[in-house]
Amino acid sequence: MRFTFRLFAVLIIITASGTQALAQDEAKQAQGGGDLRAAVQNPVGAMYSLPFKFTFDYGASNGEASFLNIQPVIPITVGDWNLINRLIVPLIDSPGEVTGLPSIPNPIPGDGATGLGDINYSLFISPAKPKGAIWGIGPSITIPSASDKELGSEKWSAGPTGVILFQPKWGTFGMLARHLGSFAGDSDRKDINQSLFEPFVNYNLPKGWYLISDIIITANWDLDSSDIWTVPLGGGVGKLFKIGSQAINARTEAYYNVVQPDNAPNWQWGFTLQFLFPK
């Protein structure tokens, strides 16, 4: 936990420094900034990026959980198609059994742990030059890589994933969805049967600022009916800026769970720092 907060503080300082650098480079940012912002807001855009996503979950009966997700995006263009490789490598600090967390769908009781969680890989196949709606589909797989059984599912799981979005002049809106079902792993752990729905909207403002709502709704279908759904509501604000020639996207958000299972967090606050490498 202390490591997570120290790294978070370092990234906050980087963001502040970049905002000062942007003030010296506003004219350059204004030129072509819209294209970069559109690419950032497109989950299947053909742009290399390295996001660091911090989330802090509050309100569970046994304490707070925190996550640092390292989420590299590696696009490969093959003819008329983009192959978008997305990896999620979670570092987790958990107080014990906490429900309603997308990355630990079958939590178990314990005294808490800190370390690596289960790694997820998704591949989106998307048209390189879409007309109208932008879309991508492909497989997703979660690997039981957790360093402690409290931080993962101890199950191999896989399933389909897809995204559709639109980018009018004012911003971006769309939906990402994924379903994972377990097919191997520790027989003593509950099976995985989880769907994820992620509606998102970005409203662009001047000088690289934007408003965002990126809601992650989860359904764990094998739980009791009262515990299946976790539904948050909320949003936040973000900004594109540069440090030298390095383009960076930073955003902060807060969400409240209007529907949640027992022993789930009430609130989530997040901060994302995304390093961008346009082709």
Which positions does each model-derived feature cover?
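Cleavable N-terminal export/targeting peptides
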Residues: M1-G33, R37
